[in-house]
From Swiss-Prot:
It is a multi-pass membrane protein. The chain crosses the membrane at residues 36-56, 68-88, 89-109. Disulfide bonds: none annotated. This is Non-structural protein ORF5. GO terms for cellular component: host cell Golgi apparatus; host cell membrane; membrane. PROSITE patterns: COV_VIROPORIN_3A_CD (PS51967), COV_VIROPORIN_3A_TM (PS51966).
């Protein structure tokens, strides 16, 4: 129902005369409007998708990709809706919606493409997180988005995602570790190791000559 363009087909109100009720005349159109069912359907789609977009967590790569796909679908649906409104009778409403969506799309993709060029990876197009950990070993390198905003990384500790990229990050030995955000790129160095339930974890923090206070609280479960 919410995806049918027929819901937004303009309806014309024409005065009916008893003598000429079978004769249609375009000159006698009093008012043209779009049925309320179209707006109800459009509102229902947005009411369902926007809370879903806000409730989806980004603690794993899969969930973050799903959230990004929901965002793309929401923008695409409203863009198609705006095109239908422009082609119909609600030209001002459709034009304003198209202008808003075009500006939003431009700002979004400029930010994502900048991340892609900075990281030399396509991951930012499908993962809407804006903080990344990039590591390099002797023979390979890897990069994953993260949810924390502080420039630190603890290898083999509190691993919430089990995808191949996260597994690589938490199981390899690095010669270089970098924290990358929207406006900064910080090199991290290993400062200490600690053991929890037989698993050895390494703490990476920004390189500094000053002392770095660390407070590590062990989680209730450790997944490796």
């Amino acid at each position: 129902m919410a995806f049918s363009a027929s819901l937004f087909k303009p309806v014309q109100l024409v005065p009916v005369s008893p003598a000429f009720h079978r004769i249609e005349s375009t000159d006698s159109i009093v008012f043209t409007y779009i049925p309320a069912s179209g707006y109800v359907a459009a509102l229902a789609v947005n009411v369902c998708l926007i809370p879903l977009l806000l409730l989806l967590r980004q603690d794993t790569c899969r969930r973050s990709i799903i959230r990004t796909m929901v965002l793309y679908f929401l923008v695409l649906y409203n863009f198609l809706l705006a095109i239908v409104l422009v082609n119909g009778v609600h030209y001002p409403t459709g034009s304003c919606l198209i202008a808003f969506l075009v500006i939003l799309i431009i700002l979004w993709f400029v930010d994502r493409i900048r991340f892609c060029l900075m990281l030399n990876s396509y991951i930012p197009l499908f993962d809407m997180r804006s903080h990344f950990i990039r590591v390099s070993t002797v023979s390979s390198h890897g990069m994953v988005p993260v949810i924390h905003t502080k420039p630190l990384f603890i290898r083999n500790f509190d691993q919430r995602c089990s995808c191949s990229r996260c597994f690589y990050l938490h199981s390899s030995t690095y010669i270089e570790c970098t924290y990358i955000s929207r406006f900064s790129k910080i090199s991290l160095v290993s400062v200490t190791d600690f053991s929890l339930n037989g698993n050895v974890s390494t703490v990476f923090v920004p390189a500094t000559r000053d002392s770095v206070p660390l407070h590590i609280i062990a989680p209730s479960s450790l997944i490796v």
